[in-house]
From Swiss-Prot:
Gene Ontology CC terms: cytoplasm
Family the entry assigns: Belongs to the BlaI transcriptional regulatory family.
DNA-binding region: 7-71
Entry annotated with the keyword Transcription: yes
Molecular function as annotated in GO: DNA binding
Keyword match Ribosomal protein: no
Name of the protein described by the UniProt record: Penicillinase repressor
Assembly behavior: Homodimer.
Function: Transcriptional repressor that constitutively blocks expression of beta-lactamase. Binds DNA as a dimer.
Site (Cleavage): N101, F102
Length: 126
């Protein structure tokens, strides 16, 4: 799984966030959680679960005739891979362009600007 290119759709992120939050969860629990904030059918959610399983992003086990799902990949790992894919696709891998684009187009307050400076200073010390 570590070297495999993994991409998750926006809808699949909803499923993954529930799985990461609960560690082990049934399909019914996932459906209930997503339907609390999104109008989407049971079948659609179950299709997303199946896709994630086929991509080997989640694993499942059966207990008393119910499948339970858990993550097969660390949340931080998939977020980093997704961020790198985004950076490469939209900015040709140029981190400076990404940061400048967000900094110019978002209204950063003084605290956020100072935090960014601190982060950059910490990185430059390494």
């Amino acid at each position: 799984m570590a070297n495999k290119q993994v991409e998750i759709s926006m809808a699949e992120w909803d499923v993954m966030n529930i799985i990461w939050g609960k560690k082990s969860v049934s399909a019914n629990e996932i459906v209930v959680e997503i339907q609390k904030y999104k109008e989407v059918s049971d079948k659609t959610i179950r299709t997303l679960i199946t896709r994630l399983y086929k991509k080997e992003i989640i694993k499942r086990y059966k207990s008393e005739n119910i499948y339970f799902y858990s993550s097969n990949i660390k949340e931080d790992d998939i977020k980093m891979k997704t961020a790198k894919t985004f950076l490469n696709k939209l900015y040709g891998g140029d981190m400076k362009s990404l940061v400048l684009n967000f900094a110019k187009n978002e209204e950063l307050n003084n605290k956020e600007i100072e935090e960014l400076r601190d982060i950059l200073n910490d990185i430059s010390k390494k």
